[in-house]
Structures are given as structure tokens and as C-alpha cells.
Amino acid sequence: MKNIILANDFSENSEIAIKFAVELCKKTKSRLFIIHVFDISALLANPTEIPYFPNVDGELLEAQKTKLKEQFLNIAQDDSNQIEVVFESFEHTSVSMCILEKVEHYKGDLLVMGAHGKRQFLEFLIGSNTKSVITDCLCPVFVVPAEAEFHLPDKIMFASDIGADNIEALHALVSVAELFEAKIFVIHISTDYESFSLNRMNDFKKQMTLEINYPKLNFEFLLSNDINDRLDEYVRENSINLITMVEHEDKSFFERLFKRDHVKNMISLTQIPLLCFNQKYLVKRSFSEAEAKLKLH
């Protein structure tokens, strides 16, 4: 991990996002790019929120960059001297598109971002336009909900659908978990008692164990009539402080697992950060590893 991108919208949970990004940069010796993207038409719709700038491309961009620096120094304090930080601000009609472009431009290895409030965060998960950041980003996305508290992750839950891409996602997750010596809880919850096959689950566990050499890897296969209630319960019982998922292009992870009304009742989704891997990133990662192995031979 060399470059971490923090998309900062000055929301209420920016402090947590900054703290996490700083700690990760310290552990990986990564460079931190803090970017702010805004749509000038949206700002001008409420001119009382911004001062008058005759030169939008110059003065307003510099003002936003200065605001980024001041906020970062106030939160990071002494840690600000331990990492390399680059501050940039951009004007774009599509905030999500600009973020994706900058992740690619800076060759980002991780994107950290937050959501303003509970409602926006849940919409972020189950079908808003902003979800394109998760599904299209060429690196993992760390999402901080508004009600989250800052904790270095030591207990990570990987919500598995037993898909073929789960192994590659777990490889990526282990590289993060090792930094914090964190436990990984791989869980799969089924509502279908008839199709629930213990043999299939054991085969999945064996395959994962053979593929991934990490001593703090735990597997749980559970039956429940209510997936979201069981997930909430599991998070509380095991003091989970990071939830991981694989995002698919055809349908949101949470759209596939839950009905919309059920998601809005999940307490853990508004309190615990998410680490999201999408299929584009996992394919890219798999090819990169294959190329590296070929070069060794």
C-alpha cells in the first residue's frame, strides 16, 4: 500500500475518517492524498454558505484547499508530521465521477470516505448515485458512517455469500488485518434450512484455509429466519468494529441480502465502518498477482 485517498466533504464524521487514514498511513508508510470535490452550481444555489470569489477556478479552489489543511492539522496534530500529505480541491458537476478519476490518477490503494447522516449512509448502501463509487472504484473503499466512533480495527467481520470472489477478497482483507493483528470472522447466514448443507460449508472453509495463511481467521455458518437481526446480534456479541463485504455490479450487497425496509433497521450499519471490495478491483488484483508470479519464474 503506497497511496491512500481521503475524499473529505467536511461532514460530521470527517474526524474519524482522517484519524483512520492517518493511522493506516503510519503503519504502511503510505502517502495521504486529501481531496475535496464540489459542484459549484450546488454551492451557488445557496450563496450565503460561501464568500464571493470572482475567480472560481483560482480563489475558491485555494480556499477549499486551505480549509482541508486547517481541518487536518487540527485533527491529526502531532501525527501530521509523521506522514506525507497532499491537499487538493476540485470542481466537478459529478462528485462521484471526479473521486473515481482522482483515485485512478493518484494510483490509490485505498479510498476513505464518509457519509453525512444516518439516512444518507443507508441510501449510500442500497442504491443511491453515490454507490457508483463503491461499485466502480479500482481500490477498496473504506466508508465511515455518521454515528461511528474511532477504533483501530481488531475484530473484522467478513460477510460472505460463498461466492468465487470471496477468496480474492479475503486475501486483500488479510493484508489490512495483519497491520492491526486483527481477528477476521468470516460469516455466512442462510435462511433456507432445506438447502443448508454442512458439507458445502465445510468444503468452503477448507478451501479458504488452504488458500489463505492467516492464524486469526475464524469461520461461522449460521441459520436464521432474519438475516439482518442475526447480523446485528453477531456484531454486538463479538464486538466487531469493521464490517467487510464484496460489492457486485448487478446488485448492491445489501440489496441482495435484505429488503430495503429491513436495512434501515440495522443499527450496526450506522455505527460501524465498512470496507468494501468490488469485482473490478478483485479482478485487477488477481491479474496483478498472476503477473508478479510469472516475473518470479
Model-derived features: positions:
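Short beta-strand elements of ligand-binding domains
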Residues: 113-115, 140-146, 246, 274-278
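A short acidic, glycine-rich active-site loop
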Residues: 53-67
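Acidic (E/D-rich), amphipathic helical modules within compact regulatory domains
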Residues: 109-125
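Structural beta-alpha unit
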Residues: 73-111, 212-263, 272, 279-290, ...
